[in-house]
Amino acid sequence: MKKNLRIVSAAAAALLAVAPVAASAVSTVSAATTINASSSAINTNTNAKYDVDVTPSVSAVAANTANNTPAIAGNLTGTISASYNGKTYTANLKADTENATITAAGSTTAVKPAELAAGVAYTVTVNDVSFNFGSENAGKTVTLGSANSNVKFTGTNSDNQTETNVSTLKVKLDQNGVASLTNVSIANVYAINTTDNSNVNFYDVTSGATVTNGAVSVNADNQGQVNVANVVAAINSKYFAAQYADKKLNTRTANTEDAIKAALKDQKIDVNSVGYFKAPHTFTVNVKATSNTNGKSATLPVVVTVPNVAEPTVASVSKRIMHNAYYYDKDAKRVGTDSVKRYNSVSVLPNTTTINGKTYYQVVENGKAVDKYINAANIDGTKRTLKHNAYVYASSKKRANKVVLKKGEVVTTYGASYTFKNGQKYYKIGDNTDKTYVKVANFR
């Protein structure tokens, strides 16, 4: 069944008019915000912390009234996305504030979008939000949550109790399959100063020099484990993010901890409830810092090495190259100008891989498979059938032996052909270093 999501709203929420990803519509029949989805949209994964992932995306522009720049009115725009079973649907909310409230952190005084200031953390609260799962889901219990930790829910839970500003909310759908919430709030929304063009950079703590990549080292405990906090400390003690303004560097907060967890997740490494994980020998963390002033950001890739954890090695075999061979990458493109000369040996993975219809061996260096491949024809050869009886030659003028290969015989040749002094082309035959060649013209 095709999932459909639409939003019904009048003056719904100081959020933006952006084209929806999924089928959606905006109307003015109700002052509330309603998200509709088909019955198959409910996530039934019992391991999930919540069934429905609700993620508002909000951006704000700060008002500018400086004399030397054009006047800019502040504004707040955005979308609400709901994710079910790995699919995301985005709905638009109207760009006004009739049923939304903007407040500065620590204040209950409402702020108009036109008056938003740069560098201030705001909370946007969207009132009267409903999720419609259809009458076929009437009476079911679902849990609402968000991957964004700044998103909170207020409403009546499935036990008929009011919960305020909670990260997840378990609700019972009504007779129409609708979950009704008092509000959804998004904290730490910053208005961007569009007249500020200063960039964010990462710096070395010791030298003060700008850096574009980094490296740190941490040791594992006697069980081969490292705590995320130790990696955070190692990175933050060596590098910091800052933005130059008013003749000084203003530090910017980096997402170091989240970046570490994301890097480990990419390697399918679990982090336990107290932050410990089974450490690999190395992994790369992409630390990002974003300015709350103008929205500029920078990313610093940091290689984390755990020296007392052995680097894993892959099984490899040694293969003799029977024909001069170039290296190729995973897309079958030449890697530099280096080549392996014939009769030398190279370490490769035991099994071949196919790239663009051709068979290759992946190269192993220092116990690790690298992005370098050698055409298998230069190692294993290619089986070809003779269409004529053929002699075996050592050179253009001299036979290698008295052997006569018979028509119809299958012979293994290695690599591309060679052109001899007589202008004719020959294939190398024989898995050895002997000078044994057969004319290309003798093969089918």
Swiss-Prot record:
It is found in: Secreted, Cell wall, S-layer. Keywords: Cell wall, Glycoprotein, S-layer, Secreted, Signal. GO terms for cellular component: extracellular region; peptidoglycan-based cell wall; S-layer. Glycosylated. GO terms for molecular function: structural constituent of cell wall. Its main location: secreted. Pfam families: SlpA, SlpA_D2, SlpA_N. The S-layer is a paracrystalline mono-layered assembly of proteins which coat the surface of bacteria. This is S-layer protein.
